[in-house]
Amino acid sequence: MKIEHYQMLAMRTSQEGHDRILNGCMGLIGETGEIVDIVKKWKFQSGDHAELPKDKLIDECGDVLWYCAELSTGLDTSMAKLYIKKNHLFDDMTKIHKTAPLEITVMRLAAMSLRPTMFLFDGIPEQTTRNIGVDYLEAQAKAEIVGIMSTVRDILEIHCSTSLTDAMEHNIEKLRRRYPDGFDPERSLHRIE
């Protein structure tokens, strides 16, 4: 699945008429927290020989990607263009992720998920925003989306033996089952998996 196709399909389940930037930022923080929780439970609560719950990790990585799509759409940009344009900057990050334990990588992911919020919502005084420029702040948030996507890609490839695009397809199939006619708040509250 191509990233631009994923973004279009993912937004089929986005709720109309809400603040996509705020929802995207909050969702990234929440979903990366779920990834951290999966790894924490695997590492510290499952015993020495427990197998990493890769299916759960893939599910949550897909949810992080959904919120990347939501935030990108809110910023009126293409995930694919961001990812292709900036991905070469993250080659060194991938080298680190290949040697770092998974728990360190997911903590980095969680820290990255906070940064778009910092750039877009941290209560920067209006005068400062005018001086720095909204375009600069949005550019920083877009760079963080790429960092998040690159880190998710590395988690998927290194620790789950799957690709970013496979996780995107998995996420879209999950959303089609959950919301066959598009987003429905009632189905969101009373999920049947």
Model-derived features with residue positions:
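Flexible "arm" and connector segments at domain edges
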Residues: 1-193
